[in-house]
From Swiss-Prot:
Keyword ATP-binding: yes
Species whose genome carries this gene: Bordetella pertussis (strain Tohama I / ATCC BAA-589 / NCTC 13251)
The name this protein goes by in its record: Type IV secretion system protein PtlC
Xref: InterPro entries: CagE_TrbE_VirB, CagE_TrbE_VirB_cntrl_dom, P-loop_NTPase, T4SS_component
GO MF term set: ATP binding
Superkingdom of this protein's organism: Bacteria
Entry keyword annotation includes ATP-binding: yes
Record family assignment: Belongs to the TrbE/VirB4 family.
UniProt function note: Component of the type IV secretion system ptl essential for secretion of assembled pertussis toxin (PTX) through the outer membrane.
Keywords: ATP-binding, Cell membrane, Membrane, Nucleotide-binding, Transport
Induction summary: Cotranscribed with ptxABCDE. Activated by the two-component regulatory system BvgS/BvgA.
Length: 824
C-alpha cells in the first residue's frame, strides 16, 4: 500500500469528520428533568400526547389553536424559547395472546402476519422549554462565589418550574383530561441501580436516528452523546452506527404561505417514512416586533403593484400585536427525512415536498450548511438555526398543533391486554377494547362499562367484524380460572359457522321443531319458582286476558307440586295433570295451557308443545363457553317470541355470575322489538358491568333501534361506538340519535364502502380504524356466514357427522373451493 496515498485517503476522511462535542451545547443534568448548557441556558423537555384531530369539530380545533396561542403569549419573553419535535418513526406493534382454539390461533397468526406486512408507525411530539437567564446574568457569574451561583441557578430552576406548570396545566386541558396528556422527561433507575435519562435518549435519537436508552454520564454530556459517525455530503448525510447505517436529507421552508391554520402539516402524519420535524420559536420584544411589521408594511407600500389587502392585514396585525393578541418571534423549521436506501430517501423527500407545497409553502432541500441544519435540531443550539423567519405565535400554533391519532390502550384495561390490534390509514396501531378507561390508569380487575354499539348498512362488513371480535375474545378464556362465556343472539345464521369453529354450541329455533327447552326442570330455588310463575302465567294468558287470582293460585300450587317430583318427570303435560278441573276457571286454565303441552288434557296434542314440553332441558349456560342462538324464525312468531325470550334471558342471567361475560346481538332492533328483550337490554345496559359483563349491539337499521323504548339506554350506556361506512347515512339519526358530531357524520359518509374502514369512538376520542382481511379467504369464509358458505358448511357437517371442528373445517374449505371452481 502506498503510505503517502493511504495517509491522503485517511486525511480526506478525517477532514469530513469532526468531533461532534463542539456542536452539542449541553453540559450536564442540573436536576433530573433539567439540563444546563455551557452558556447556562436551562433545558427541559416534555412528551406531549397530542390530540385526535380526525373527527374533531372545527370549532374545537380553533379553540385549541387559540389555547396554544394564549399559552405561547403567556410564557413569552426574551428569556424563553421553544423547540418542538414531531418524530415519525417505526414501532413494534403486537399483542401477546394465547388461544386454546385452533381456528382462533390460525386466524390470529394470519391476521398478525398481514399486519406485519406493513410497517407500523407512530407519531411522537416533544416540547422543549429553553430558559436563558440573560447575558447580564451570565457576565456576573464569574464574579460570584459558588454559593451565589447556586442561589441564582435555583432561582432560574424555580422560574422554569413556574413556566412548566403553566405549560402542563394548559396542555392537559388541551387534550384528554389525564396525566399522560403531557409528561416531563426525567431520569429513572433500573433494578441494577443504573440511572437513565429520557431527555438524553431523545437527544441521542436526534443525533443518530436510533432510539436507545442513554445513561446519565459521570462526565460532560456533550462528550457522551452521539454514537454514530456523521458524514455530511452535498445534500445528504450518513449516520453510520456500529450495526447499520442510515441516510438523512433535510427540507426547509424557502417561502411561507400567506396564512396558517391549525393542522397545516397534518398530511405528513400519514406518510410511510421516518422523519423528524423541528420547529423553534423565540419571542422578540414588542418594540422589535412592531418595528418589523412597520418595515414590512412600508416595503409593500413602496411596491407599485402593492397588494392593498396585504397592507391592510399588516395594519391589523400591528393593532393586534399592541393589544396583546399574539407575540412575534424568530421561527425556524427543518424536516429531517431518514432512510436506509439513498434512492428511496430521495423519493420520500420528493413526497414530503409535495405535501408541504400543497399547503402553500415553498419547500426546498437543504444543500448549504447541511450540518448546521442537523445540529439546529438540538434545543438551545442557537447558532445553527438557518433561514429564520419572523412569525406570530398564532402562526406558530398553527404549524405546531400537536395533532395526532388516538391509539387506544394496550395494557391495563379491565380485562388486561387490549382485545385486538387494528390498523389505521396513518399506519399507527390502534389497540381496541370494548371497555373505555383512562390511558394512565391500571384498571385491571375493575368492573367498568364496556357496552358497544356497531352501526353499519348491509354489506359493510358488520358480520365479519362481529365474528372477528368474538374470536379475539377467546384469549380471555384461558386468562384465569373464571373463564369467559359469550352468548350470540344471531339472525340469519351469520355467526353459526364461526361459533361452531370455536367448538361452541349453536341453537336454531324453528317453528314446529322441538327446542330442547324444559323450564320445569330448573332447580327448585325461590328465583326459579318466581320465574316459572311469571312464565306460565304468560303462557296461560289468552288474547291479553289476564288470569284471575284463583287461576294464579291454582297454577302456583301445580308448579310447586311438579317441582317436588324427580326432574325426569317434570313436563308441561305433567303440570296439566296436576291442575284440578273442579271449576270453570280451572277448566279454562287447563284449556289455555293445553296448547303448550304434548298431551293437551283432551286427548290431543297442543299446537305449541315443541316450545317447552321436551323430555330434557338442553339449555345450559353454566359452563364457560361460546353459545349461539338463531332467532330468524321465532322472532317473527308473535305467539312464541316473548315466552322463548323470557326463558333464554332467565337462563342467561345465571351465567352472569362474575365470570367474564359478553352477549352479542346482531340486528339488535329485531331482538329488542320483543318486550322481554327490550326490558332486559335496557336494564342490563345499566347493571351488566357490575357483573363483569358487557353487551355488543349491531344493526343496519338505526331508525328501528332509535325508535325502541329502551333507545336512551342503548345510546347513552355505551363505552364504545363503531360506525361502518354509510354514504346514505341519515343526518338526523346520526347527529340527533347517536350524538355524532358533524365531522364524525361526514367521515362516516365519506369512507368508501369497500375500504374496510370504520370509525371507533370512545368518550371524546375517535379514530378511523381498519379491519382488512383481504387474502385471508379461508378465515373470511368462516367469519362471513353468507348463504353459499352455509350450504357448504351443512354439507361438511353431514359428511363428518359433526365431529371436531378440525375435521369439518377441512372438508368445508374443500367443498367451498369446489363450489367456486364450478365442480359442484
Amino acid at each position: 500500500m502506498n503510505r503517502r496515498g493511504g495517509q491522503t485517503a485517511f486525511a480526506a476522511i478525517a477532514r469530513n469528520e469532526r468531533a461532534i462535542a463542539a456542536f452539542i451545547p449541553y453540559s450536564s443534568h442540573l436536576t433530573d428533568t433539567t439540563l444546563i448548557t455551557h452558556g447556562a441556558d436551562l433545558v427541559r423537555t416534555w412528551r406531549v400526547q397530542g390530540i385526535a384531530f380526525e373527527s374533531a369539530e372545527p370549532e374545537l380545533v380553533s379553540q385549541r389553536h387559540e389555547q396554544l396561542n394564549g399559552l405561547w403569549r403567556a410564557i413569552s419573553c426574551e428569556q424563553v424559547a421553544l423547540w418542538i419535535h414531531c418524530i415519525r418513526r417505526k414501532t413494534q406493534a403486537g399483542l401477546d395472546a394465547r388461544y386454546e382454539n385452533p381456528f382462533c390461533r390460525a386466524l390470529d397468526a394470519s391476521y398478525n402476519a398481514r399486519l406485519n406486512a406493513r410497517q407500523a408507525m407512530t407519531n411522537e411530539f416533544y416540547l422543549t422549554l429553553v430558559y436563558r437567564p440573560g447575558h447580564a446574568a451570565l457576565g456576573k457569574r464569574a464574579h460570584h462565589g459558588q454559593a451565589e451561583v447556586r442561589r441564582q441557578l435555583l432561582a432560574h430552576v424555580r422560574r422554569m418550574d413556574e413556566i412548566g406548570s403553566l405549560i402542563e396545566t394548559t396542555l392537559r386541558s388541551h387534550g384528554e383530561n389525564h396525566e399522560q396528556a403531557i409528561t416531563v422527561l426525567g431520569c429513572e433507575t433500573d433494578s441494577a441501580g443504573r440511572r437513565y435519562s429520557r431527555t438524553l435518549t431523545l437527544l441521542e435519537f436526534l443525533l443518530t436516528g436510533h432510539w436507545q436508552p442513554v445513561r446519565v454520564p459521570a462526565g460532560p454530556v456533550d462528550a457522551y452523546l452521539g454514537s454514530s459517525r456523521i458524514l455530511a455530503g452535498a445534500e445528504m448525510m450518513e449516520l453510520r452506527a456500529p450495526t447499520c447505517r442510515r441516510y438523512a436529507q433535510f427540507i426547509d421552508f424557502k417561502e411561507y404561505g400567506t396564512h396558517t391554520e391549525p393542522g397545516m402539516l397534518n398530511a405528513l402524519l400519514y406518510e410511510d417514512y421516518e422523519y423528524v420535524i423541528t420547529h423553534s420559536f423565540s419571542a422578540v420584544g414588542k418594540r422589535q416586533a412592531l418595528a418589523y411589521l412597520q418595515r414590512q408594511r412600508a416595503q409593500l407600500a413602496n411596491v407599485q403593484d402593492a397588494a392593498y389587502s396585504q397592507i391592510d392585514d399588516l395594519a391589523h396585525a400591528e393593532d393586534a400585536l399592541v393589544n396583546g393578541d399574539f407575540v412575534i418571534g424568530e421561527y425556524h423549521f427543518s424536516m429531517m427525512i431518514l432512510g436506509a436506501d439513498p434512492r428511496q430517501l430521495r423519493r420520500d423527500v420528493s413526497s414530503a415536498m409535495t405535501r408541504i407545497q400543497e399547503r402553500g409553502f415553498l419547500a426546498t432541500p437543504v444543500t448549504l450548511a447541511l450540518d448546521a441544519a442537523f445540529y439546529a435540531q438540538l434545543p438551545a443550539n442557537w447558532a445553527y438555526r438557518s433561514r429564520k423567519a419572523m412569525l406570530t405565535s398564532r402562526n406558530f400554533a398553527g404549524l405546531c398543533s400537536f395533532h395526532n391519532f388516538y391509539g387506544g390502550k394496550r395494557d391495563g384495561n379491565p380485562w388486561g391486554p387490549a382485545l385486538s390490534l387494528l390498523s389505521t390509514p396513518s399506519g399507527q396501531p390502534f389497540y381496541f377494547n370494548f371497555h373505555h378507561s383512562g390511558l394512565d390508569e391500571d384498571c385491571r380487575g375493575q368492573m367498568m362499562l364496556g357496552n358497544t354499539r356497531i352501526i353499519g348498512q348491509s354489506g359493510s362488513g358488520k358480520t365479519v367484524l362481529l365474528n372477528f371480535l368474538l374470536c379475539q375474545l377467546q384469549k380471555f378464556r384461558s386468562a384465569d380460572a373464571d373463564g369467559l362465556t359469550t352468548i350470540f343472539f344471531d339472525k340469519d345464521r351469520g355467526a353459526e359457522i364461526c361459533i361452531r369453529a370455536l367448538d361452541g354450541q349453536y341453537l336454531r329455533i324453528r317453528d314446529g321443531e322441538p327446542t330442547g327447552f324444559n323450564p320445569l326442570q330448573l332447580p327448585c330455588t325461590d328465583r326459579n319458582v318466581m320465574f316459572l310463575d311469571s312464565l306460565l302465567a304468560m303462557l296461560a294468558r289468552a288474547h291479553d286476558s289476564p288470569l284471575t287470582s284463583a287461576q294464579h293460585a291454582t297454577l302456583a300450587t301445580a308448579v310447586r307440586t311438579v317441582l317436588r317430583m324427580p326432574a325426569s318427570l317434570r313436563r308441561m303435560s305433567t303440570l296439566l295433570q296436576n291442575i284440578t278441573q273442579a271449576t270453570s276457571e280451572q277448566r279454562e286454565l287447563v284449556r289455555r295451557l293445553g296448547r303448550w303441552c304434548r298431551d293437551d288434557g283432551a286427548g290431543g296434542t297442543g299446537m305449541l308443545w315443541w316450545v317447552f314440553d321436551n323430555p330434557n332441558d338442553c339449555l345450559d349456560f353454566s359452563r364457560p363457553g361460546n353459545y349461539g342462538i338463531d332467532g330468524t324464525a321465532f322472532l317473527d312468531n308473535a305467539e312464541t317470541r316473548t315466552p322463548i325470550s323470557m326463558y333464554l334471558l332467565h337462563r342467561m342471567n345465571e351465567a352472569m355470575d362474575g365470570r367474564r361475560f359478553v352477549y352479542l346481538m346482531d340486528e339488535a332492533w329485531k331482538w329488542i322489538d320483543d318486550p322481554a328483550f327490550a326490558e332486559f337490554a335496557g336494564d342490563q345496559q345499566l347493571t351488566i358491568r357490575k357483573k363483569n359483563g358487557l353487551g355488543v349491539f349491531s344493526t343496519q337499521m338505526p331508525s328501528s333501534l332509535l325508535g325502541a323504548r329502551v333507545a336512551a339506554s342503548l345510546v347513552q350506556q355505551c363505552a364504545t361506538e363503531i360506525y361502518l361506512p354509510n354514504p346514505r347515512a341519515d343526518r338526523a339519526e346520526y347527529l340527533d340519535g347517536f350524538k355524532c358530531t358533524e365531522t364524525e357524520y361526514q367521515l362516516i359518509r365519506s369512507m368508501a364502502e369497500d375500504s374496510h374502514l370504520f370509525l371507533v369512538k370512545q368518550g371524546r376520542q375517535a379514530v378511523v380504524a381498519q379491519l382488512d382481511l383481504s387474502g385471508m379467504d379461508d378465515e373470511l369464509a368462516i367469519l362471513s356466514g353468507n348463504a353459499r358458505n352455509l350450504r357448504c358448511f351443512e354439507q361438511a357437517l353431514a359428511l363428518t357427522r359433526e365431529r371436531d371442528p378440525n375435521d369439518w373445517i377441512a372438508v368445508f374449505h374443500r367443498l367451498r373451493r369446489e363450489a367456486s371452481a364450478g365442480l359442484r
